[in-house]
């Protein structure tokens, strides 16, 4: 009997040893396949990092670029003489702005006014503010609806803008790398439509198909939470169709969405994740880090991680396991510092640092952007990285540029762009309630391959980012009337003709001013 037990243990031991060898071989093969997929690109970019921020119109941050006021006591900004022309606010618009009966000109907000109210940026309200191309109804329709908002004149605040003495880092990145002054939200509306457009070029396909003021004709027009997320509350929806994650998976290309506060702080009695991490913004107000409706992949069952499960190991970050490519922001750094940077990474700041008016601000946002970019520039992969800074919506902030309307809609309840309460007439190649393009948003590309001190005037939108991913890794289009098929290219912001062009730029997170620049 003892001999039999010994034999079984011996056999078991051998089996376990063989199993371990097989598993190690599988992991090695997975890593080798991931490396191979990263290396097969159609440009010099092998790693793409998309930093997706919140609620800023182009004029709100770049109205007077590259000319800053430079008052005493604020970080100084001096532009390069080589700075090209930018479509910002003209002297006429600054002093004689057409905005209906309110007669309020755009005005500068200083660093002491960094905490502002949240403007009205709902799908119908933004269209009404643009008033069929007259752009004269922002105060009437896009001003804050918060009765407690008294900052900078309450309704007038929507006309406010920051300059290079507050958003100093972004202005310095624009000086050193490439920016666009002609990039737009894919459609009008708030955060969730913007996030869905970023990953799928599509806001149609929601279930339920109609929820008052939230989903219309199967199209998302507001901010419901994702159904497949333990941390969601209130109105929840699911999305159908493909997104950029599903087609990256089909080609075995590593990727991930990394969001602040995604890691659970505890679990409920029935095992549901609790997202309870909190930070204070510069005003001392506590904000929960995780915002469910800012996490677009959680609307899709195929890419959701409902219980916020961690990756099984660092080596699996970017690959398919129980995390389903949805991670805490800390997992991005765990992967990067262990030589496992995914080919495509989407980074989402915690709530207090995402730039969203009402609970975040440009100074907290600058801390996140600069700390993140400084750190990425020190990675060994920097030589083949492109960082894209993009935004989900405008928050309703004034911008003087009328977007080209490439997708029309005629929902009489929610489409308000034209005097007839329409956004043109829906056609075969468009779903209802997808009026767009929407407001103009900032877009910057930071990379060794960025053109330097460059301003791109090509028309692009949020789906131009997924078009770059599709083209660079040979994925094909998403289909189902996704806007990726219509998107302009961001390639003009980069130059791959004769090697890297732009040197590293290290900034101070507090001031946004340059601390060190070096080649390589």
Where are the predicted features?
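N-terminal pro-sequences and low-complexity stem/linker regions of secreted or lumenal proteins
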Residues: 28-520
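Bacterial N-terminal signal peptides
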Residues: 11-25
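Positively charged n-region of N-terminal signal peptides that target proteins for export
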Residues: 1-4
């Amino acid at each position: 009997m003892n001999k039999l037990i010994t034999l079984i243990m011996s056999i078991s031991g051998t089996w376990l040893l063989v199993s371990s060898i097989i598993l190690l071989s599988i992991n090695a093969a997975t890593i080798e396949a991931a490396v191979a997929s990263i290396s097969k690109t159609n440009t010099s970019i092998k790693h793409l990092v998309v930093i997706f921020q919140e609620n800023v119109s182009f004029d709100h941050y770049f109205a007077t670029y590259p000319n800053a006021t430079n008052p005493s006591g604020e970080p100084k900004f001096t532009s390069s003489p080589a700075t090209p022309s930018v479509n910002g606010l003209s002297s006429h618009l600054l002093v004689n702005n057409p905005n209906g009966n309110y007669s309020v000109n755009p005005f500068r907000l200083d660093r002491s006014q960094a905490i502002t109210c949240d403007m009205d940026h709902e799908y119908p309200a933004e269209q009404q503010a643009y008033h069929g191309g007259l752009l004269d109804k922002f105060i009437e329709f896009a001003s804050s609806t918060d009765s407690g908002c008294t900052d900078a004149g309450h309704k007038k605040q929507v006309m406010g803008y920051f300059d290079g003495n507050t958003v100093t880092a972004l202005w310095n990145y624009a000086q050193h790398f490439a920016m666009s002054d002609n990039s737009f939200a894919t459609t009008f509306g708030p955060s969730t439509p913007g996030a869905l457009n970023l990953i799928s070029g599509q806001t149609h396909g929601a279930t339920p198909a109609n929820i008052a003021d939230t989903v219309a004709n199967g199209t998302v027009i507001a901010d419901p939470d994702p159904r497949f997320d333990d941390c969601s509350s209130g109105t929840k929806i699911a999305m159908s169709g493909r997104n950029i994650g599903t087609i990256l998976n089909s080609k075995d290309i590593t990727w991930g969405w990394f969001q602040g506060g995604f890691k659970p702080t505890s679990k409920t009695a029935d095992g549901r994740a609790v997202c309870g991490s909190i930070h204070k913004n510069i005003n001392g107000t506590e904000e929960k880090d995780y915002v469910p409706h800012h996490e677009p992949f959680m609307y899709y069952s195929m890419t959701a991680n409902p219980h916020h499960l961690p990756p099984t190991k660092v080596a699996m970050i970017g690959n398919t396991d129980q995390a389903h490519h949805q991670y805490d922001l800390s997992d991005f750094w765990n992967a990067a510092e262990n030589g496992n940077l995914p080919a495509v990474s989407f980074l989402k700041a915690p709530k207090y640092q995402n730039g969203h008016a009402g609970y975040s601000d440009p100074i907290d946002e600058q801390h996140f952007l600069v700390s993140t970019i400084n750190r990425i520039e020190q990675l060994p992969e920097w030589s083949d990285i492109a960082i894209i800074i993009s935004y989900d919506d405008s928050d309703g902030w004034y911008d003087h540029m009328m977007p080209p309307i490439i997708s029309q809609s005629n929902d009489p309840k929610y489409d308000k762009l034209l005097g007839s309460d329409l956004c043109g007439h829906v056609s075969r190649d468009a779903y209802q309630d997808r009026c767009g393009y929407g407001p103009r948003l900032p877009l910057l590309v930071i990379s060794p391959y960025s053109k330097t001190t460059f301003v791109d005037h090509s028309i692009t939108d949020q789906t131009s980012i997924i078009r770059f991913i599709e083209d660079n890794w040979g994925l094909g289009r998403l289909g189902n009337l996704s806007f990726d098929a219509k998107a302009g290219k961001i390639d003009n912001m980069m130059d791959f003709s004769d090697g890297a062009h732009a040197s590293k730029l290290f900034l101070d997170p507090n001031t946004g001013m340059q601390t060190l620049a070096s080649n390589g």
